[in-house]
Amino acid sequence: MITRADALKLDAADILKHKRAEFSIPDGMIYLDGNSLGVLPKAAMARVKHAVDVEWGVDLITSWNKHGWFQKPLVIGNKIARLIGAPKDSVIVADSISVNMFKVLSAALAKNPSRKVIVSDSGNFPSDLYVAQGLNGFINNGHSLRVVEPEAVMDAITDDVAVVMLTETDYRSARRHDMKAVTDKAHATGALVIWDLAHSAGAVPGQLEEVNADFAVGCTYKYLNGGPGSPAFAYVHPRLQNEVMPALVGWWGHAAPFEFSQNYEPAAGIMRMQCGTQPVLSMQALDAAMDVWADVDMVDVYAKAQKMCALFVQLAEARCAKHNVQLFGPRDFSKRGSHVSLRHEQSYAVMQALISKRVIGDFRAPDMMRFGFAPLYNSYADVWDAVEVLRQVLDEKLWDVPQFRERKAVT
């Protein structure tokens, strides 16, 4: 069995170890929840302070030009594009994932007007399904949502399907879809594909251009470390950008927003996927957070993440075997994202006990503890130490107290 000394040797050889110093990690905390909210980059603190003190505090309205506020959605989008395998000027930062999903799904359905079926799976994040349900009701034109098990997606893509809407990395199991196989099958039947990259961006090597994906959305507050509620992104393949129109439009997506025309004329390219004025302070924090990735290769990031995931599972199953802790998700780590879910009948209480011991993960219903591994700031020693605390919590039944059973508003 691997020892803590072995974990420290892995850390010493880690080619990403220098990145940890760029983050503000609370002393004594093992933070394994970057799949839910990333750690604060030190550069983001300085950038936001400058944005408040100087750009807003002194330069005020001139900052739209002087400090490039107006251009930020595309500037940051191009930084994200490199990580998700997208070409230049195909990604825009705006709004939330749910709003962006509404925009790209409405655009995709309008592009395929004779077809009425949206295919998704039971592993998709529920908000995407809610958006599809709401949009179908809003359109009120006979559209339906076909939700199948992840393994049945390929068979569900038939010639009546307008859009296939999937999350690449399952938010619970970390199972990854084969993006190329799904996209190829959809295109062969005449359907368009939307990929939700919420648990992929900054976690796994991107491949949007490689697989010829039509649309994608993703968030920036998880592995990209943009901050709580940081704006999301939308991707549209260049061949579609000037052909599609989202149902939700606004002045920032206008071809000439400062001419204030009473009639909407879409901007060229990806710019039309914007709607309203962007949140500047959040944009500045995200811009600084993305600069942390400038010297990082996603292949290296994913390789480290998979090693950490495998080590975590190996240690947890060995040291917590008598407590019936079970892996939820694939054992083939090449087919996973960068988080691990463990099942236990008292998962919520166990997670609260872990948090009280400064090991931070989260809980997902009905019985899953999630642990996310962010290679820019997590270490192999973090993995070893976290499992040791998990063993202690289970062996000593530290979870078995009333306050750890009481569900909080956010789990």
Give short role names for the model-derived ranges:
Residues M1-T411:
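Pyridoxal 5′-phosphate
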